[in-house]
A protein has these predicted regions:
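Short beta-strand segments within Ig-like beta-sandwich modules, predominantly Fibronectin type-III
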Residues: 45-50
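Residue-level recognition of strand-loop junctions within catalytic nucleotide-signaling folds
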Residues: 25-27, 56, 75
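Glycine-centered coil/turn sites that cap beta-strands in beta-rich domains
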Residues: 1-34, 52, 80
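C-terminal tail/sorting-segment detector
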Residues: 7, 63, 67-91
Length: 91
């Protein structure tokens, strides 16, 4: 991708019975994805590969995150481009 115009996450919303990976697609080359909770706290850092990043729905300690809206903030490592997508987790 040359920009983040096609950025999306799936599945979204994430239903209580789903325990698979959440995929963030439409990333540019060399993108870091920071997952933030509704209060803006850092939950997880992901590295984009092949235009996508995969989140297991867990925080950095390996614990499943609480229900709520999370924001995947996507930044190129050069800092030139950024965008975000919201993900609803229902547990």
């Amino acid at each position: 991708e040359e920009n983040f115009n096609n950025l999306y996450a799936y599945p979204n919303p994430v239903h209580p019975t789903y325990r698979g990976h959440i995929t963030i697609k439409g990333l540019m080359v060399d993108t870091q994805v920071r997952i933030l909770d509704a209060a803006g706290n850092l939950v997880k850092i992901l590295e984009g590969q092949g235009g996508a990043a995969v989140w297991d729905g867990n925080n950095e300690r390996g614990q499943r995150v609480a229900s709520g809206v999370y924001t995947a903030v996507c930044n190129t490592k050069s800092g030139e481009s950024h965008n975000s997508v919201k993900i609803l987790i229902m547990n």
